[in-house]
Amino acid sequence: MTIHQSPEAFGYDAFLRTHQSKEVLRFITCGSVDDGKSTLIGRLLHDTKQIFDDQVTALQRDSRKHGTQGAEVDLALLVDGLQAEREQGITIDVAYRFFSTDRRSFIVADTPGHEQYTRNMATGASTADVAVILVDARHGLTRQTRRHALLVSLLGIHRVALAINKMDLVGWSQDKFDAILSGFQAFAAPLNFSEVRAIPLSAKNGDNVVLPGTAATWYDGVPLLRYLEEVPVKSEERAAAFRMPVQWVNRPNSDFRGFSGLIASGSVAPGDAVTVAPSGKTSTVARIFTADGDLERASEGQSVTLVLADEVDASRGAVIATSDAPLTLTDSLDVRLFWAAETDLAPGASLWAKVGTQTVNAVVKAVHRRIDPETGQAGPADKLAVNDIGDVTLTLDRQIAVDPYVENRDTGSLILIDRETTDTAALGLVQTVVAATKAVTPAPTASESKAQEPARSGGLLAGIKRLFGG
């Protein structure tokens, strides 16, 4: 069977026409160092025929220089792109790869396993729908396996594929497989996963990755790829209320005025009643404008321009939401932080908080507790160090519109930015929202916003991806 193909034989136009309307699933691979995360992704790319001839030639050359599989091709090198990663044989940065099957398109994030790169792992998990947690069958559950399972839970990923790798090195022992699964289920019981699917596999040999293996006669489940093709994630996302942070006001002439942005959640159609935060003004959607023409309905992930039936004052930083479930306005946030800066975080610290498309001034009012990344237990704390996870209260200089993270991952998350370096210092998840009692603080003018925002903005997702080089 031909695994790779030439660009000419591939057919780009046909590929784009076929795959542009497919459902996209984002997932991450995580686990301890050397559990085989990069090899697994390489195997997925290889066996789904996503590799071109020139890539195969380069892979063979790189395998001779940097490979860890002896004379065999090292599939991990398809993902480990940094020179330091190849020289050390580990993953440091978060590597994103795309592949597609007849059923779905996939965006996979290969996250680092070393503890000092946990902040990078949180970057990859922040946008994922499913987590593939790898476990080396020889070693079982490790400290970093538990840490990553906890991080996955804290970041709101509810479905886990427990990929028990290197089963060929333990003779495909069912007893070993059952022991690892039992241990993980016991640890994960309080983490509120809706599903844990355990799959025995060998990423190096390809058993139970894309195609079913024959060695584990006792396993009657599906391969990993089939699980990823069938897991019903998007149906859960569609239940979220409509939210669209305004990126800019589109006014090419005096006859047209619309609000442009990326729909963060839910869907919208002409005639829907909406509320604009923080002003609280209400209106209805008159048009959904795009470069390809008007739409009858737009959904999560689409970039559109909404034209409202009424003249509503709004600018960058505002959020348009369904009137049936408006956002809460607040100037005080209880957040769970993934602290990434080398300097400690203590009460009184002043940072920028970027929420959606709006940047506000934030002061740490209190550090309440630190979360043990291995047990999930909380303990009292008065500061957070690098890689710590903890609960803090932030005081903001104006009211913003947010949701709790458990209700909406987009409008319930933020990043904290160091004022001096403009580096991303933390990823924050809004825990509880208490409505402000004072009058709404007017949104800053465009010139004020430009003066206050750090030079390196680019949106929440771009900021998250900058999380210490992520």
From Swiss-Prot:
Its EC number is 2.7.7.4. This is Sulfate adenylyltransferase subunit 1. Residues 22-237 form the tr-type G domain. GO terms for molecular function: ATP binding; GTP binding; GTPase activity; sulfate adenylyltransferase (ATP) activity. One of its GO terms (biological process) is hydrogen sulfide biosynthetic process. Residues 202-204 are annotated as: G5. NCBIfam families: CysN (TIGR02034), PRK05124.1 (NF003478). GTP binds at residues 31-38, 110-114, 165-168. It catalyses: sulfate + ATP + H(+) = adenosine 5'-phosphosulfate + diphosphate. Heterodimer composed of CysD, the smaller subunit, and CysN. Residues 165-168 are annotated as: G4. Residues 110-113 are annotated as: G3. Pathway: Sulfur metabolism; hydrogen sulfide biosynthesis; sulfite from sulfate: step 1/3. The keyword rRNA-binding does not apply. Belongs to the TRAFAC class translation factor GTPase superfamily. Classic translation factor GTPase family. CysN/NodQ subfamily. Residues 89-93 are annotated as: G2. PANTHER family: TRANSLATION FACTOR. The gene is cysN. InterPro entries: CysN_GTP-bd (IPR041757), CysN_II (IPR044138), CysN_NoDQ_III (IPR044139), G_TR_CS (IPR031157), GTP-eEF1A_C (IPR054696), P-loop_NTPase (IPR027417), SO4_adenylTrfase_lsu (IPR011779), T_Tr_GTP-bd_dom (IPR000795). It comes from the Bacteria. SUPFAM superfamilies: EF-Tu/eEF-1alpha/eIF2-gamma C-terminal domain (SSF50465), P-loop containing nucleoside triphosphate hydrolases (SSF52540), Translation proteins (SSF50447). Keywords: ATP-binding, GTP-binding, Nucleotide-binding, Nucleotidyltransferase, Transferase. With CysD forms the ATP sulfurylase (ATPS) that catalyzes the adenylation of sulfate producing adenosine 5'-phosphosulfate (APS) and diphosphate, the first enzymatic step in sulfur assimilation pathway. APS synthesis involves the formation of a high-energy phosphoric-sulfuric acid anhydride bond driven by GTP hydrolysis by CysN coupled to ATP hydrolysis by CysD. Residues 31-38 are annotated as: G1.
